[in-house]
Amino acid sequence: LPDIRGSLGATFEEGSWITTAYLVAEIIVIPLTGWLVSAFSMRRVLIVGTTGFLLFSVACSLAPTIGAMIAARALQGAFGGVLIPLSFQLIATELPLSRRPLGMALFAVANNVAQAAGPSIGGWLTDVYSWRWIFYLQIPPGLALLAAIARSIRPQAVHAAGLRNGDWGGIATMALGLSAMQIVLEEGGRRDWFASPFIVQTSILAATSL
């Protein structure tokens, strides 16, 4: 983050939104994933989610300003949010019962290795090349995932009635409440928690919306 802030001429507070914007968008989309799958099918949601994640990874790498970076990160988080719950659903639905424990174990190991190695790899890329390569690095595995989805998951019909019957008011208040809660959790420590009027107001918004 310091290298990105310096390159884009952002303050510390502005730079913190690079992470916050991603997490806010992601936490809104995760609970909506099941509803999206029931309307559009797992295959379509995975393809759109992965494609959008890759496109906005490129947008992040090309961002000329901190505003563009924050917007691209938010959209990257929104598209990437479907990938977390659908990873578990794929293991549960596509693997035979006898192989599901192995699938869960491999997923957990891969996730832990990625989280442990990510900062080191990102730091090395930043030192040797540029912070922009952190986002380029996500493209090859994303393309491999798209190929695997297209090859292995069967197409299914679209059920648009599920969208018409959706509780749009509930979705809006849930999105507002979850985003406010995530902002409180991310920004609270930097703003001295409830000594900050912004954190107090955002906490009230989260409580009333949820």
Regions found by a protein language model. Give the residues of each.
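Hydrophobic transmembrane-helix bundles of small-molecule transporters
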Residues: 127-210
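Transmembrane-helix bundle of Major Facilitator Superfamily
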Residues: 1-152
